[in-house]
């Protein structure tokens, strides 16, 4: 707070604006209590009440529907975090920038940061004291270089900034894929297999930021995922596992803040990725962790050398924090499963768990392989027996029964399972063999169609790499709910549909339904 500027009081007004993770407040240019021209030189202000402080980005308006002359309008995130009723008088002053920003500037200049400096930055991030611009500055500074000690300090600070779970079991397993592959909903098959065996697997997952579905978005089609800490513990106690949204239990909140900025800017460096994943797994109380690194031309990791470097980073951090970490590389050349988008991916998962004859074989096989690795952490299971045990649990229906138990424990979903009513097909332009699939382009196309906000939007794949196709045969179908999304997706597919048949792009269908 600036001591030379007097504070004034304004009444809280709730402004129904979704400003993402950033706190934003609005004052009137004709404010009776505050002179807007004085505040114009300050990008941030402090709201204070009974020891509670909220830092927010300031906007000035001429619209009385956002803030009257005696009011300060709080965006939805700011209103939720300040947690005071509409009409409450609060003190408003220009904000002093967080002291930790000096360390951010030092990092940009090339200095190595101490553990205390990194801890201060993460603490301020976790309390939403940074604007998106300041977050980007930290990410850019860290992207230039980060030492091993800084990586460990960053991981530890992020893990300690939120909820830290402790479990009574000596072995608590978990798995994580670094992402980038459409579909690939293996966690929703692996968790019930491992839980049915008896190993605890408390799986917390993220929502999509730049992809058409995260595990939490897909699980939400089947069950409630906004579960609190105590309820999560009760579910794991009764079911040996869960599939919930990690943001609701406040695991590594600073990481969620960083991800919200770094993903859209494509600033996801190897070190930041490792710190992000490991901080959440450490905070979740996992003792044994399996990391899946898909490798492919349009995946996050494109080659074996890059995958090896990433593996060593995961193993290094895991060792320093006393965790057993196993890293495997998998085929990242194409989507896993037939669906891209929450409802379509949930359908794939339930088909695999139900041993449906039309279930995607790639999703089934990859899930069995991953589950096998985790099951072999059970000291009572002899070495090499993991795959057979995983297949037994899946084929017998035990995994499906366990999934239903988890769904019942988490509570019913309120989401529709209907697919988008509008659709169009992408068809092969000529006879041949599917030679390549662009994962990144399909992800973008599914998002353009409305996923994950519209859970029934997305893409259903009919052909994979190596499949023979005839001219005019559908390669995939795009689903949307609204005409604008349908038309945007059709235009995007016309510009590049993500499939190559004998090295040539397919052409979009002229017909739509």
UniProtKB/Swiss-Prot annotation:
It catalyses: thymidine + phosphate = 2-deoxy-alpha-D-ribose 1-phosphate + thymine. GO terms for molecular function: 1,4-alpha-oligoglucan phosphorylase activity; thymidine phosphorylase activity. Pfam families: Glycos_trans_3N (PF02885), Glycos_transf_3 (PF00591), PYNP_C (PF07831). Its EC number is 2.4.2.4. The keyword Glycosyltransferase applies. Keywords: Glycosyltransferase, Transferase. It comes from the Bacteria. GO terms for cellular component: cytosol. One of its GO terms (biological process) is pyrimidine nucleobase metabolic process. NCBIfam families: ARCH_P_rylase (TIGR02645), PRK04350.1 (NF003338). HAMAP family: Thymid_phosp_2 (MF_00703). Belongs to the thymidine/pyrimidine-nucleoside phosphorylase family. Type 2 subfamily. This is Putative thymidine phosphorylase.
